[in-house]
UniProtKB/Swiss-Prot annotation:
Residues 1-17, 25-34 have a biased composition (Basic and acidic residues). It is a multi-pass membrane protein. The gene is MIR1. The lineage of its organism: Eukaryota, Fungi, Dikarya, Ascomycota, Pezizomycotina. It is found in: Cell membrane. Its main location: membrane. It comes from the Eukaryota. It comes from Gibberella zeae (strain ATCC MYA-4620 / CBS 123657 / FGSC 9075 / NRRL 31084 / PH-1) (Wheat head blight fungus). Keywords: Cell membrane, Ion transport, Iron, Iron transport, Membrane, Transmembrane, Transmembrane helix, Transport. Major facilitator transporter involved in extracellular siderophore uptake. Gibberella zeae produces extracellular coprogen-type siderophores as well as the intracellular siderophore ferricrocin. The role of extracellular siderophores is to supply iron to the fungus during plant infection, and the intracellular ferricrocin is required for intracellular iron distribution and storage with a crucial role in ascus and ascospore development. PROSITE patterns: MFS (PS50850). Belongs to the major facilitator superfamily. Residues 1-69 are annotated as: Disordered. This is MFS siderochrome iron transporter 1. GO terms for biological process: iron ion transport.
Length: 609
């Protein structure tokens, strides 16, 4: 069956699992202490959380998929009940390879984007791109979750990989900043959705107890790409002298992994249909009926209100410094007002008017899910307030080459690749995860504050790497445990939706962080540059700010280069100070988490990790 046929059938399926305010029949009453959730009732009815969200009961090792779940969940359960160890190993290897490509993609992006924007004299607008792409990506996670649950994991994954490939091709052939920004939206939505779908697959193919190790496994390729990716990206800048081939290479390689992964899922699903493990359930709504159903089910109006409102509201904070009259410019004021009103109307639409709300109410009422989402939001904002210009800072201020700057900025990938296995193993042994935040949060905030001290021009790079290592320790724990906390609080049928809610929070955080970073940059770097440049170079301030190539053209220790470095330091200190202030919110969110014992819970069926 083709993917297109599958999608058409998915549009015709009846969605029998809309969120209800009451518990499902299989959900049992539980009690919790402030720190540990305990279960009551027989062993086969143990649940994870109280309130509106409950996971599957412990004894769900039956040889048939659950009946009270959506079609995509039923199909993935049928796959895990049907496949053998070879198929499971093939899936895990393909996921690992996909994350290897993702690591190269991330390294390429960090190193190449400063040169991409500089080609069009738009280095100062570097944060504009992620504001738009992150906001639109955040708006697409919830519909993506519904696609995975209604159409199926394989179809949703293939659709997103298609968007990612298209975006990469458009980035490679773009000839101006506007085209590159549009390509970045396709790429970001597709890549983010693809990685999200793989995250859901990793949850489908692993027990909750081993999920930390599963996520650590998928992150391990980053230890390779932290060095190889940065070196390869530098080669495109220095040797090939064409950044477009960096994105083009990823576009060529990506289908070589995504198509086999899609086929592994489809082949095993076909076996499940043949064996009678699962049967096809369809309802004929007709073409226009299916279109109308999809329009409402995927909340298309909500997507555009949320994504568009967020973009229009956040962009002025980045553009005001370039506007003719600054903050008093008419279109800057209009964008802020229109964006804010659009976000208000989005709330009104979702609460009173939307046929199927964008976010599920049951998740918004569970304190553990809310806490994990707020931790993710806080982490992304605090991290991206300073990180977008970090690679440029390392080259211009610390005098590193593109490859070496990529190595330093990839410290997170190396540290997390090792640390995640350790944390995942400890969680597997203890069954609890909340304790990891008690050392991760102080380390992260301390390192972020310490980084402020090492932002002076020509500072010893070893101190910066030391701070990066500590920041990476905290960040790696956040990324792993946030996902685990959300997944431990829901049943298998809600895994995709719960992860999507977490990803929405992260996407919004990235967009807000980019807006703060851009606002600080445009309102501090350029004024300081004009103030500090030698008289003979003041007329070139705009050209210098717009291109990293122009910045690097001035010799080290020359008056102009020192002025540029001091301006970078001035802006970076304020970016980091904002990050530290925002990170202090962790102390509010962490106590809200429930300390669920994942050793006693089981969500999946069949042969899993």
């Amino acid at each position: 069956m083709s993917a297109l046929t599958k999608i058409r059938e998915g549009l015709a399926r009846e969605d029998n699992t809309h969120v209800a305010g009451t518990l499902a029949p299989h959900e049992k009453e539980i009690h919790e202490t402030p720190e540990v959730v305990s279960e009551v009732g027989p062993d086969h009815d143990k649940e994870a959380t109280a309130g509106a969200i409950n996971p599957d009961d412990k004894g769900n090792d039956s040889d048939v998929p659950s009946e009270d779940v959506q079609n995509g969940v039923k199909e993935i359960q049928a796959i895990t009940l049907t496949w053998g160890k070879g198929s499971l190993a093939a899936l895990l290897c393909l996921i690992w390879t996909l994350f290897l490509i993702s690591g190269f993609r991330g390294s390429f992006y960090l190193v190449l984007v400063p040169y991409v924007t500089s080609e069009w004299s738009a280095h100062s607008l570097m944060t504009t791109i992620p504001i738009v792409s992150d906001a639109m990506t955040a708006a697409c996670y919830i519909p993506m979750a519904k696609a995975l649950d209604v159409w199926g994991r394989a179809e949703g994954f293939l659709l997103m990989s298609g968007f990612a490939t298209l975006g990469l091709i458009l980035m490679a052939v773009s000839q101006n900043l506007a085209t590159f920004c549009a390509a970045q939206v396709f790429y970001s939505v597709g890549w983010g959705g693809m990685i999200y779908a793989v995250g859901v697959l990793a949850a489908d193919a692993s027990n909750l107890r081993n999920r930390g190790l599963a996520f650590a496994f998928t992150s391990s390729p980053y230890m390779i790409t932290a060095f190889a990716g940065s070196k390869a990206a530098a080669a495109f800048v220095i040797d090939v002298k064409n950044w477009r081939w960096g994105f083009g290479w990823i576009a060529l390689v990506l289908p070589c992994v995504t198509i086999p992964l899609f086929l592994v899922l489809k082949v095993n699903l076909r076996k499940a249909f043949k064996n009678g493990t699962v049967t096809k359930t369809t309802r004929n709504r007709g073409f226009f009926g299916s279109i109308w159903w999809a329009f409402n089910e995927f909340d298309v109006i909500g997507i555009f209100l949320f994504g568009g409102g967020l973009v229009v509201f956040l962009l002025p904070f980045n553009l005001a410094g370039h506007a003719p009259n600054g903050w008093s410019t008419g279109y800057i004021i209009a964008m802020i007002i229109v964006g804010f009103c659009t976000l208000i109307f989005f709330g009104v639409w979702e609460y009173w008017l939307a046929p199927v709300p964008f976010l599920q109410g049951r998740f918004l009422l569970d304190r553990s899910v809310v806490a994990a989402c707020m931790i993710d939001l806080t982490y992304q904002v605090s991290y991206y307030t300073w990180n977008y210009f970090f690679t440029s800072f390392l080259q211009v201020v610390v005098n590193l080459g593109p490859a070496e700057a990529g190595y330093v900025n990839s410290t997170f990938q190396v540290v997390s690749g090792v640390l995640l296995f350790i944390v995942g193993f400890l969680i597997r042994k203890t069954g609890f995860y909340k304790w990891t935040f008690y050392f991760a949060v102080p380390i992260y905030i301390f390192a972020l504050g310490l980084m402020i001290h090492f932002r002076a021009p020509n500072q010893y790079v070893g101190y910066i790497i030391m701070c990066e290592i500590f920041i990476s320790i905290g960040g790696a724990v956040f990324i792993l445990v946030m996902q685990l906390a959300v997944l431990a609080a829901v049943a298998h049928q809600y895994v995709a939706a719960a992860l999507a809610t977490l990803y929405v929070a992260g996407g919004v955080g990235g967009a807000v962080g980019g807006a703060i970073s851009g606002a600080i940059w445009t309102n501090s770097f350029i004024p300081q540059l004009i103030k500090r440049l030698p008289e003979s170079e003041v007329a070139n301030a705009t050209l210098i700010a717009g291109s990293i190539v122009n910045q690097l053209a001035y010799p080290v220790d020359s008056p102009a280069r020192l002025a540029i470095q001091e301006s970078y330091g001035f802006a970076q200190i304020r970016m980091l100070a904002a990050g530290v202030g925002i990170a202090s919110l962790f102390f509010i969110w962490v106590p809200m988490l429930r300390n669920i014992d994942v050793k006693k819970l089981k969500q999946t069926k069949g042969l899993v990790l």
